[in-house]
């Protein structure tokens, strides 16, 4: 079985860079990123590896909602200028890049689901909780910085909702990290309570007369934002990959 290690490029590199943010020379960062990749390869023993990078095009999410990810700090100039060197250095060590047009998340999700559909296994290396919506026994998510798997069970326990309610939960409660609005006035606690009673976002709105008047007003006023947030949270699984599995296969000595 093909075992594919999929690295969320900017998630990995920016976290490593944040440990020494004032470093002007990119060579040190380059070595630390490569060191992290070597550790990941040794631990997971994949047959294939790719590091997926965000592109410069405006994402469909940003086009749909202008405030999406608003307020995030821009990439430090030294890091931005050195990304090409990092990619080239990793390629020299058999870690090929896959460039997304805009956000890497949808490309990673598409790649992972396509792999498991043909009998492979995908390990996504990222701390982004959005990947928790990809529930499949052969898709795993690894948090490199805490050296642990981000499991569906852990996510359910942390949020207080079932896996199938994950997108509904974020549609109601929002996601401050990505500036996904959710329904104003419906925070995490209320979202959990509503989903325990009504089981889904659709059921909440179809049974709105059974919701307390205070919450019902908030839900009605924020209905368009709930729908918008639901769309923004969902990962796209049909992105064009323009890549061949063979180009990501590791040499026998590395796999």
Curated annotation (Swiss-Prot):
Pfam families: 5_3_exonuc, 5_3_exonuc_N
GO biological process: DNA replication, Okazaki fragment processing
Entry keyword set: DNA-binding, Endonuclease, Hydrolase, Magnesium, Metal-binding, Nuclease, Potassium
Ranges annotated as spanning the membrane: none
Region Interaction with DNA, residue ranges: 185-190
Binding site for K(+): 172-173, 181, 183, 186
Ligand binding (Mg(2+)): 105
UniProt xrefs under InterPro entries: 5-3_exonucl_a-hlix_arch_N (IPR020046), 5-3_exonuclease (IPR002421), 5-3_exonuclease_C_sf (IPR036279), DNA_polI_H3TH (IPR020045), FEN (IPR038969), HhH2 (IPR008918), PIN-like_dom_sf (IPR029060), Xni (IPR022895)
EC id: 3.1.-.-
An MF annotation (GO) of this entry: potassium ion binding
Cofactor binding mode and count: Binds 2 Mg(2+) per subunit. Only one magnesium ion has a direct interaction with the protein, the other interactions are indirect. Binds 1 K(+) per subunit. The potassium ion strongly increases the affinity for DNA.
5'-3' exonuclease domain residues: 162-254
Cofactor(s) required for function per UniProt: Mg(2+); K(+)
HAMAP family the record matches: Xni (MF_01192)
Homology family: Belongs to the Xni family.
Function of the protein: Has flap endonuclease activity. During DNA replication, flap endonucleases cleave the 5'-overhanging flap structure that is generated by displacement synthesis when DNA polymerase encounters the 5'-end of a downstream Okazaki fragment.
Protein's UniProt name: Flap endonuclease Xni
